[in-house]
């Protein structure tokens, strides 16, 4: 049996990062700063690393060296857990800032949304250049839509329109709303509308055209680009299965002291309960998979909504359980180190740029349809294959980190050129959803 090099290194690195610089509360006491700006920055860094590990765990299994990345299987089904952390921290930070900063909503969208929009278009330039270099075949209308963001050239960039929608909903909800209950309800409904649209539309516009057009052999791939799977906004469960964490974050910030007092009583019992809830919700998802209940049933001719709604309900339970687990755990221990700090300060850019190195190095290594096919018969877990996969992993991480620094630098420079963009808060926000 071949020694699992990838597993040892990846999971060992995670363990080291979680332990190095960890802030541990003394016996009988609790961390008071586990949801401070510094702490949540490091939490975002952890989430950014989790997302790229999720994407690294998803290569096609074609009998080549990339199969060794299957040792990261643990991350394959939980990518949205890490994205949920981004939404949770964003919702938490907004409510905290609203409560502590005078006139926080003044120029809110300009301060919070504009840097994200600039970052999106800076990112898009890199992907445009990459696809031009590859000679990607797209119609003029598809190019125009993807250049301007009406459709996405980078599938991972779905986070940008969703977080902008959430920020806009937050601004509308709290701008003139004297009742916080109604404001919270408005934000919840904004999330529900996004969920509702996905449950109706699913992964492509099945309703656009003659009834059942998509069931004909090859029809999906012969259709105009905008009718093909995951071509437009909200065509995919990843658009909606973690956004509820934004609302959870708002609730946590609004009830911060009550939650702290509640969880400090019988902390161990509640922590164990959160662990069991995470395990049970994950097991329930696996059970649904076993019963052929999942998001992609339309590709086998079943367009009913109920199976997706069931799976989304379980995903929502998973997000709640995961956030609860993280929240309770961090009351006792949270991690602070240079890696998480760097990733936390570049979380949006790191998230947006990772798809480019993932694809580019798979081509350079000959593991993609755009490069040489892997030779048949290569050992799936041989040492040579594992070392090749490990080199790929390191190069992807390094290139993504470098690109994130470049994109953040360019974003800040462009924002600085905009009229009246000299406030310190605006400069802090220029890297994404970092500043409170």
Regions found by a protein language model. Name each.
Residues 165-172, 247-260, 320-335:
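Alpha-helical transmembrane segments in multipass membrane proteins, preferentially the mid-helix core
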Residues 90, 248, 343:
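Short glycine-rich loop/turn motifs that provide flexible caps or phosphate-binding loops at active sites
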